[in-house]
Swiss-Prot record:
Homotrimer. Interacts with SRK2E, CPK6, CPK21, CPK23 and PP2CA. The channel is inactivated upon PP2CA and ABI1 binding. Interacts with KAT1, KAT2, KAT3/KC1 and AKT2. Interacts with GHR1. The chain crosses the membrane at residues 190-210, 217-237, 266-286, 296-316, 326-346, 353-373, 389-409, 419-439, 441-463, 480-500. One of its GO terms (cellular component) is membrane. The record marks F450 as: Important for channel gating. It comes from the Eukaryota. This is Guard cell S-type anion channel SLAC1. Phosphorylation by SRK2E, especially on Ser-120, activates the channel. Also phosphorylated and activated by CPK21 and CPK23. Abscisic acid (ABA) promotes phosphorylation. This phosphorylation is inhibited by ABI1. Phosphorylated and activated by GHR1; this phosphorylation is repressed by ABI2 but not ABI1. Phosphorylated by HT1 on N-terminus but not C-terminus. Residues 25-34 have a biased composition (Low complexity). Residues 211-216, 287-295, 347-352, 410-418, 464-479 are extracellular. It is found in: Cell membrane. Changing G194D: In slac1-2; impaired anion transport activity, strong insensitivity to abscisic acid (ABA), altered CO(2)-dependent leaf temperature change and stomatal closure, reduced sensitivity to darkness, and defective regulation of transpiration in response to drought stress. The gene is SLAC1. Residues 86-99 have a biased composition (Gly residues). Slow, weak voltage-dependent S-type anion efflux channel involved in maintenance of anion homeostasis. Cl(-) efflux through SLAC1 causes membrane depolarization, which activates outward-rectifying K1 channels, leading to KCl and water efflux to reduce turgor further and cause stomatal closure, that reduces water loss and promotes leaf turgor. Essential for stomatal closure in response to CO(2), abscisic acid (ABA), ozone O(3), light/dark transitions, humidity change, calcium ions, hydrogen peroxide H(2)O(2), reactive oxygen species (ROS), and nitric oxide.
Length: 556
């Protein structure tokens, strides 16, 4: 059949069969990509996509339609479902996709000693070998590094969202199944020490209310301090015992929390709680003792000091965990302990040590405060909307005010300056009505109550230095607010734990992969490039139209 000739306004692109050598190169490239990204372990895995050759002329519009269709298909493959089951041939938790209905293996987060004992069994050796083979690509590299290797701080910011970095982004995958309930120890976060922070700070508050001359008209009995102190001690022992079990059986998960930019600050919390309990010890336990034993300060402040040397060194030396990169409101936990330690050092009679800790804490508080206040582009953890995490801003200046008063014995200008800074920040936060609304409850919220309690204690000290009805009213108001918030959180915790049973959901933040599993195919030169010939055809069409118009003008 004869083919009609096209006029000057209709341009066609002549697409011929690709030569044998070029076709083999294209098929080899496509075959390699299929092996790399395919997750099926079946007889169809080795099948190649049929090569499409054209031996006829197609219009430019057809070329564009084919190009758009292939672009849509390529975009559809860029996102991974956040189910923990999107590895190629790799089921969640290290189970090969065999369809035999086996339960998820959580041994990847166990301690190395426990995991090595499991590997001594023959079935486990075979399973681990299959996992390694399923994760290995053609060139010998793995899709994701070992679970035992540390996750970078940038990876947490890239894979997680929220002010506490505890929510996985939609386009990210996790190592464990989201639908299945994980073991309790894996779901028990370091943030549970926030409960101890809130309760132990209440013990300090009620001791101050019972002993302060500014509130003696209330005739508050010291028994309240005793009850709160004992309850705080029981909660601290329970939480510490549970987390020690997690360290024993799931140490790899603990390492994940330590390298988390937000949760690393909660490793300071147990020692701050212990110092709070030492400061607020009931009078009936030491009625005639002016100073505490120095060993108490050494036991509680020693681990805190060595941990802050590690963290402050990372801030100072730069790198991936420099302060402008990982700064978040929870970073105040790594600062406020210096002021609490200064108070305890003064209680044991070491005034010079107390002054040293106060100076270190205040210097780093200024750095953290300025870094967060500037909202640097690299500080990704600071939420734009109001969140209870903002209450951490008032913790350090309040504690600094109390520490200065304890060291020097008077509420002078420096102590009042810190107190007024904390008071202004407190008012600026309380002025917002929706302070605790619209956010998912978390046990980490408990740690946000102790700054309010610390501000209340600082206000009581201020009322002692500046007696009067306004100062007393302010002290009672802030004390009532902090106690009410602790009661509300206590009731909410009981409801989530025993009624709704949602207090400890799956801790998705520790199950992220070391690097993103979504990979884009590397561009390579193809003998037949649809995009290239489409552009060339468009250029030829424009050139032909210009020649045709020029030819018509010459005829006229």
């Amino acid at each position: 059949m004869e083919r009609k000739q096209s006029n000057a306004h209709s341009t066609f692109a002549d697409i011929n069969e690709v030569e044998d050598e070029a076709e083999q190169e294209l098929q080899q490239q496509e075959n390699n990509n299929n092996k790399r990204f395919s997750g099926n372990r079946g007889p169809n895995r080795g099948k190649q996509r049929p090569f499409r050759g054209f031996s006829r002329q197609v219009s430019l519009e057809t070329g564009f339609s084919v190009l758009n269709r292939e672009s849509r298909e390529r975009d559809d493959k860029k996102s991974l479902p956040r189910s923990g089951r999107s590895f190629g041939g790799f089921e969640s938790g290290g189970i090969i996709n065999g369809g035999d209905g086996r339960k998820t293996d959580f041994s990847m987060f166990r301690t190395k000693s426990t995991l090595s004992k499991q590997k001594s069994l023959l079935p486990s050796i075979i399973r681990e070998r299959d996992i390694e083979n399923s994760l290995r690509t053609e060139d010998g590299e793995t899709k994701d590094d070992s679970i035992n290797e540390n996750v970078s701080a940038g990876r947490y910011f890239a894979a997680l969202r929220g002010p506490e970095l505890d929510e996985v982004k939609d386009n990210e995958d996790i190592l464990l199944p989201k639908e299945e309930q994980w073991p309790f120890l894996l779901r028990f976060p370091i943030g549970c020490f926030g409960i101890c922070l809130g309760l132990s700070s209440q013990a300090v508050l009620w001791l101050a209310l019972a002993k302060s001359p500014a509130t003696n008209f209330l005739h508050i009995t010291p028994l309240i301090n005793l009850v709160v102190w004992l309850f705080s001690l029981v909660v601290l022992v329970s939480v510490s015992f549970t987390y020690i079990l997690k360290c024993i059986f799931y140490f790899e998960a603990v390492k994940r929390e330590y390298f988390h930019p937000v949760r690393v600050n909660f490793f300071f919390a147990p020692w701050v709680v212990c110092m709070f309990l030492a400061i607020s010890v009931p009078p009936m336990f030491s009625p005639n003792r002016k100073y505490l034993h120095p060993a108490i300060w050494c036991v509680f402040m020693g681990p805190y000091f060595f941990l802050e040397l590690k963290i402050y060194g990372q801030w100072l030396s730069g790198g991936k965990r420099r302060l402008c990169k990982v700064a978040n409101p929870s970073s105040h936990l790594s600062v406020v302990g210096n002021f609490v330690g200064a108070i305890l050092a003064s209680k044991v009679g070491w005034d010079e040590v107390a002054k040293f800790l106060w100076a270190v804490g205040f210097a780093h508080y200024l750095v953290v405060f300025v870094t967060l206040y500037q909202r640097l582009p690299t500080s990704e953890a600071l939420p734009k909307e109001l969140h209870p995490v903002y209450s951490m801003f008032i913790a350090a200046p309040s504690a600094a005010s109390i520490a200065w008063n304890t060291i020097y014995g008077q509420f002078d200008g420096c102590s009042r300056t810190c107190f007024f800074i904390a008071l202004f920040l407190y008012i600026s936060l309380v002025a917002r009505i929706n302070f605790f609304t619209g956010f998912k409850f978390s046990v980490a919220w408990w740690s946000y109550t102790f700054p309010m309690t610390t501000a209340s204690v600082a206000t009581i000290k201020y009322a002692e230095a500046v007696p009067g009805y306004p100062s007393r009213a302010l002290a009672l108001t802030l004390s009532f607010i902090s106690t009410a918030m602790v009661c509300v959180l206590f009731v909410s915790t009981l409801l989530h734990a025993f009624v709704w049973q949602t207090l400890f959901p799956n801790d998705l933040a520790i199950a992220i992969t070391k690097r993103k599993l979504t990979r884009e195919k590397k561009p390579f030169k193809r003998a037949y490039d649809l995009k290239r010939w489409t552009k060339q055809a468009l250029a030829k069409k424009i050139s032909a139209e210009k020649d045709f118009e020029a030819e018509e003008e010459s005829h006229h």
